[in-house]
Amino acid sequence: MAGNDWINSYLEAILDVGPGLDDKKSSLLLRERGRFSPTRYFVEEVITGFDETDLHRSWIRAQATRSPQRRNTRLENMCWRIWNLARQKKQLEGEQAQWMAKRRQERERGRREAVADMSEDLSEGEKGDIVADMSSHGESTRGRLPRISSVETMEAWVSQQRGKKLYIVLISLHGLIRGENMELGRDSDTGGQVKYVVELARALGSMPGVYRVDLLTRQVSSPEVDWSYGEPTELAPISTDGLMTEMGESSGAYIIRIPFGPREKYIPKEQLWPYIPEFVDGALNHIIQMSKVLGEQIGSGYPVWPVAIHGHYADAGDSAALLSGALNVPMLFTGHSLGRDKLEQLLAQGRKSKDEINSTYKIMRRIEAEELTLDASEIVITSTRQEIDEQWRLYDGFDPILERKLRARIKRNVSCYGRFMPRMAVIPPGMEFHHIVPHEGDMDGETEGSEDGKTPDPPIWAEIMRFFSNPRKPMILALARPDPKKNLTTLVKAFGECRPLRDLANLTLIMGNRDNIDEMSSTNSALLLSILKMIDKYDLYGQVAYPKHHKQSDVPDIYRLAAKTKGVFINPAFIEPFGLTLIEAAAYGLPMVATKNGGPVDIHRVLDNGLLVDPHDQQAIADALLKLVADKQLWAKCRANGLKNIHLFSWPEHCKTYLSRIASCKPRQPRWLRSIDDDDENSETDSPSDSLRDIHDISLNLRFSLDGEKNDNKENADNTLDPEVRRSKLENAVLSLSKGALKSTSKSWSSDKADQNPGAGKFPAIRRRRHIFVIAVDCDASSGLSGSVKKIFEAVEKERAEGSIGFILATSFNISEVQSFLLSEGMNPTDFDAYICNSGGDLYYSSFHSEQNPFVVDLYYHSHIEYRWGGEGLRKTLVRWAASIIDKNGENGDHIVVEDEDNSADYCYTFKVCKPGTVPPSKELRKVMRIQALRCHAVYCQNGSRINVIPVLASRSQALRYLYLRWGMDLSKLVVFVGESGDTDYEGLIGGLRKAVIMKGLCTNASSLIHGNRNYPLSDVLPFDSPNVIQADEECSSTEIRCLLEKLAVLKG
């Protein structure tokens, strides 16, 4: 019963200190995330320290003590609730342990298989290279932070950049972003990331060799925010730390605000997911237009494409991956905060189940976006090694051991068998130092101005010092938003319970801006109330400052005030991804006390200007603060070290490392633009030259692919041939195709002359259409598809005859199946202008002479989507995976998934699924491939009876963006017809600038067969509230379809 005595004493303590568990706000925070009150501490002690039987006994005892007193009733209820909390936590911990064990097994198995596939040519020398290459992951801080150490070195680097004119695109979607007077701390979305991306854009824009930087974000025209966030373009002031000497007409750093989502509503980042496609389309439009403008200015008339697209946070990373795939340019990513790490922390608290966490934070959609960034990124930039070793390692798509093996093979020019891993680059954020003048004096003089009166004190000083009874004491400064994970309550408790520290110092808490605590979010307001109660409990009046308002421009003055009083800066967060405020404080001469979890460890190793503490150890925090405040020699040493080493974190040095990483990326851009014979894609010339030129483009494309660099990830049968034989074989094939197309074009030209439609000679025909209808209905049977096509044709029969509306068929069929479908339904190939086949793995155009050559393949499209295509190495792994899927319920253990070689293509590996209900869901196949560093897009289609595996950035929706880029097909003029459900790429077809008609009653079986086991529900990502999305009733007629198109303003009523 000793355990029960302890429990009972804890329960009594809970009743004595602060609000009980039945208090509304305390209950909310207890269920969520707050480490903010003694109540939480006692509850944690009970839940984690005692057996369930002891908790049950305490409840029995409380229940037996019947009394009308309110205290006893509360005690009984509290026992019951804590007992249930303990059981819930135990269950969640068990589930998490099982998941971690399973994950370790899967990763080890995947690593073994990957190494086995690559073991054929693994030599001892290569193994030595692996060990040597690990030096970049060693313990040397200087090695991890390769910085410019002298003016001469910087000048030499600057001279090398002369003549370069790079265009860089940064993306940061959530929060409120503007170039000056940033409202940091206004809400949880407007924090350190906003400051980072703005300063990065400004710093890059001032670097030699960089012509223009665009920071893309969301345009917010809500009346609840400042009007400046609704301005479409803002020129960000160039950093004076930069080294740029030449300017151009459109040069510099710009904040570009793209409208997407609710037009007049500011929404949190968790609600942005359904509108990501709309942002991608708007951003694509801006980049294409800007590339043309820059081409006129600095590109000799040729478009200047971004040298890289850099996404920040998961939502922008998802967008950057799609833009990178659409434009075929390199992608970079910075996570800032990672979903898997947050999920683990929330699960460890035991307050919510995984489903509840996902409902609140849309965490699974966020994690999938982060996995996609690993698939698509050339480089992932982190602030610290801790992010790599403890956070990115949680992801299926990144394995540090396998990454080092692949890197060693690449250095030795040995095949990786289709495996790819992004490079992790540790580049700590920079800082602007031009305005910083470290304070050299102290508070021995007057506190409200200098003696000569020439330099009055900043107003924020008076705002802070009015709280103090003795403002001359050293100031302990904490600057963080009121978030429980920032651990400010432990700091206040440590200060309040350490009498020597209270006697020697004051405490200043800068916790964002507020007007009325009751109007803040429940979490933030509860935390502030808790801090105010602690101030009252420990009687800290006159010793703690907590001003309500400050501007971003006041922050430097706050640092200066703390340094003037010989104070200390503290960051006690439970986990700090980086700790930019620590660098800022050091630049003003402030020693630091910081958490030992995360980025501060690396910062401390470089600056050596303070002490690290366990954020959970209240006494350690108090001791470290007291040591720095009381020992003036230690304080002076830490201050001097910080000022001496702070240049290692300047923005110019950050940008130099950043640009050198970009330079290491393999250059990519739209291939067809390399053709000197390629005239203006949007030419309005009414002649056959368009079609002739594009047939010529096809042969040029092949020539480029043959003359270009070796692609070692295609291990197919043709790779065994001599290169010259392969070259001759492929050129002859395309020459034959070109001749046939040219002949058919010539024959059809005379008949086309009689066509009165403007632009009739253009190839492909989509270039002359006013609107394009994309039929992407994934029907349960081919009869459903044919019925839908005929209804849509009938609905716009007049416009179809006039040629103002064209059609694209987007399907999982290959081109042979498409041709069979058209023949069986009595349709002509020219009824459609283009065919997106194999779920986006192939793109064809209808030919002018359908008898001899009904379809023309777009080979440029293949070169556009081949990024990280695993080729034969991927196919072998897929075949091995398919062989492992066996029907355990069958008598003979039949294979459920088998390779369909007849329907496979160079960029689409097709597999038949014999029993769709028993195959693992698509998320499991993605995980298996990612664990082995194979990057692909697995599409479950045709009601789960087929799996199409295509390049990672290929899809039907991405093919539509390619057509916009290639032919200028206006995305806002597209109407996509889809069923009530569809293949696993269904969500990508709805949303964006294009309009969508959802035909209810079609493809309903897919919801249960292939969408039933998703990571996240479709409702989390589909913009059903968008005015561009409309639903058609079941069995709707062609007349009803026409009415819907009139509602979408596609047709005139």
From Swiss-Prot:
Segments passing through the bilayer: none
UniProt-recorded name of the protein: Probable sucrose-phosphate synthase
Pfam families the record matches: Glycos_transf_1, GT-B_Sucrose_synth, S6PP
GO MF, one annotated term: sucrose-phosphate synthase activity
UniProt function note: Plays a role in photosynthetic sucrose synthesis by catalyzing the rate-limiting step of sucrose biosynthesis from UDP-glucose and fructose- 6-phosphate. Involved in the regulation of carbon partitioning in the leaves of plants. May regulate the synthesis of sucrose and therefore play a major role as a limiting factor in the export of photoassimilates out of the leaf. Plays a role for sucrose availability that is essential for plant growth and fiber elongation.
Pathway: Glycan biosynthesis; sucrose biosynthesis; sucrose from D-fructose 6-phosphate and UDP-alpha-D-glucose: step 1/2
Record's subunit section: Homodimer or homotetramer.
Catalytic reaction(s) noted: beta-D-fructose 6-phosphate + UDP-alpha-D-glucose = sucrose 6(F)-phosphate + UDP + H(+)
Protein species of origin: Solanum tuberosum (Potato)
Top-level division of the source organism's lineage: Eukaryota
Biased composition (Basic and acidic residues): 103-115
